[in-house]
Design a protein with these regions (language model features):
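Alpha-helix exit/C-cap motif
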Residues: 56-81
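Surface-exposed intrinsically disordered loops and tails
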Residues: 76-163, 206
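Short, conserved catalytic or interaction motifs in soluble domains
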Residues: 3, 29, 44
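Aliphatic-rich helix starts adjacent to a transmembrane/signal segment
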Residues: 34-55, 65
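Short, surface-exposed interaction loops/tails
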Residues: 144-210
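N-terminal leader/signal peptides at the extreme start of proteins
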Residues: 1-12
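Alpha-helical hydrophobic helix detector
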Residues: 18-34
């Protein structure tokens, strides 16, 4: 006679399920904030590295332009900004205005012989962004061309296009970059040579006036 084997396997009881779910909830409450913080730090570090590459490209373009056309810097260096509470005058300023215009039309005649346009054109080349169709960055995605004193969301919007960025470069009459703002994906990087680079969620770009 065949005996029925006793099946000792059984599912979780309601109490056991509640205990398991409680443990999962506790672990999630501990791990999710840490994971979110890690992701945010990784994003910020990646943007800082991008901004550093942009600073290198900008300084290279600046040095080349100054070596060839030093006289072109005189008229272009008419702007002011404030860094760490200190007002700095007689600076050149390159923004999305020039970058976007040249990205759209490389033969744009506005301020054609100024240092800002010469530098902007070279910066676009170094950043692989001279042609909109294959550009790494897009500078003409908004009609709001004034980059100074703006948060990332104010300038780019809360849902910016993937390649849309804010770029603001300040430089001296002798071709030295003194500050850069780089806005992307809701963050604002401020890079000032000799100081710690910052990356702030919806941070604000440096102010400026002429």
């Amino acid at each position: 006679m065949n005996r029925k084997r006793k099946n000792n396997k059984h599912g979780f009881t309601l109490v056991e399920l509640i205990v398991v779910l409680t443990i999962i909830a506790v672990l999630a409450s501990l791990l999710i904030p840490s994971l979110t913080e890690y992701i945010n730090k990784a994003k910020k570090q990646a943007l800082i590295e991008e901004a550093t590459d942009i600073w290198k490209a900008s300084q290279t373009a600046m040095s080349e332009c100054y070596a060839l056309y030093p006289e072109s810097f005189d008229d272009s260096c008419k702007f002011t900004t404030t860094i760490n509470g200190k007002k700095i005058s007689n600076l050149g300023r390159i923004t999305n205005g020039a970058l976007g215009a040249l990205q759209t039309n490389p033969n744009d005649p506005v301020e054609a012989n100024t240092s800002s346009r010469k530098i902007a054109q070279q910066v676009l080349i170094y950043l692989d962004s001279a042609k909109p169709s294959s550009a790494r960055y897009l500078f003409n995605t908004t009609s709001n061309w004034a980059t100074w004193g703006k948060t990332a969301d104010e300038f780019l919007g809360k849902n910016p296009k993937p390649k849309a960025v804010l770029l603001q470069i300040f430089h001296t009459k002798d071709g030295k970059v003194v500050a850069i703002n780089f806005g992307k994906n809701g963050y604002m990087v401020t890079l000032i040579p000799g100081q710690e680079t910052t990356c702030v969620r919806n941070g604000k770009s440096l102010p400026s006036s002429s």
